[in-house]
Amino acid sequence: MTGAAGFIGSALLCRLLSDVDSGDVTGLDLGDAPPAASGRRLSWIRGGLDDRAVLEQLGAAPFDLAFHLASVPGSRAEAEPVLGRRVNLDASLDLFQLLAQSRNRPRVVYASSVAVYGALSDAPVGVQTEARPAITYGAHKRMVEIALADHTRRGDLSGIALRLPGIVARPRPVSGFGSAFMSELLHALAAGERYVCPVSPAATAWWLSARATVDNLLLAGRIDCCGTLQLPALRLSIAEVVAGLARLYGPERSALVTFDPDKAIEAVFGRYPMLDVRAELALGFSHDGSPVELIRNALRA
């Protein structure tokens, strides 16, 4: 698992290690293994995928299943395009090539992103929607999707790419993500703190908890389906999320939010249309079900 100490990676790692049937796990990250993840079944490699020595360590043993989660976040990749390319594109291609040489056709689950779509219209969005990425991060994600599909076509990998929406609630301080306000809103109101929201109450986004994301990643590792899929998510307005927080923590929490919309942020992260994920739902992928369950899952993940 790459990015194994990250927000999603650490949650997935702990889930895998809690399952005695999941086998041995190798985690890779720039940092140390999460404190909650330990045991004889865990091997840890500290380093980056863009380091040739790290790739050589990974190549020492074959893998049956690989979760590729590591990436440079969108806003940083936009500010530092050379770093973004080295990690998000080149290192991903090198990883796939390494896994393809193992000759046992490993299953590869790749964490892609809704950033591949670019500017959105009011029409429902799904994998059938044309990918027109508007930022470097999204462009690199789309390139890696194509590379994984080509390895799958050639028969040396069994690849599935999942386009992830906004995942909540990232631990504080939330940085490097344009959608950071989604997590900050949940943390602030749950803690009884005042929060100035940079988008309007009517702004809509796609919301998915880390807990539900892990469920979907594990499913992707088990099923035979290959290709690119859009993960289901709840399409909720900020007002609906605030109402859910008020139901859980008390009606007075609604008054803690004030709004100071930033047009640039709302244009990119606050005008999401409906999702068309009928095919993904039929395969067993899922979202959190309701605003209240989303909040519960997000804050206990």
Label the predicted regions.
Residues 149-203, 210:
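NAD(P)-dependent short-chain dehydrogenase/reductase
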Residues 198, 212, 216-270:
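Mid/C-terminal beta-alpha module of Rossmann-like enzyme folds, strongest
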